[in-house]
Amino acid sequence: DLAGVFMWHTGNWYGGHPADCFCPACARAFRAWLAERYGDVERLNAAWGTDFWSQRYTDLEQVAPPAAMPTFPNPAQMLDWRRFSDHQLRSLMEAEARILREHSNLPVTTNFMGDFPATDYWRWADSLDIVSDDSYPDPADPAAAHEVAWAGDLMRGLAGGRPWIL
């Protein structure tokens, strides 16, 4: 531990700029996550309602991430993609926190961002020693004070009785 350092902060703005990656490695990881979640392609077809969407799969290798398409995607596939993306980001944060904890006794945090849709903060909060939030209120926006108050209430709930910081 270093003098003057009182806490570690893992990566910044997980899921921002951009939140999604559709590269071949992420596509393979998505299929592996689906295999873990559903066990086989028939359970995936049932969960996703693929008969209705004319997207029935015969092998998990046929499943691609819901990248740009001419129409809207299967909503169940999008939900699982969001869950997968959150899982990947959270796994990265947890790996960074684990490394920090191996070398330091200082608390670990990362910045949440109010109501940020790319991550499930309820799942993330238990992996952190201290919940923290970024806030960038626009002084010209009359609703900004309400948004900051709402985010503070959310952080207090996520902290579960533990301290949290802004």
Annotate each predicted stretch with a short phrase.
Residues 1-148:
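Polysaccharide-binding and catalytic clefts of secreted carbohydrate-active enzymes
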Residues 134-135, 163-166:
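Aromatic/acidic polysaccharide-binding cleft in carbohydrate-active enzymes
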Residues 105-106, 159-163:
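A short helix->loop->beta-strand "cap" motif at the edges of active sites that frequently abuts
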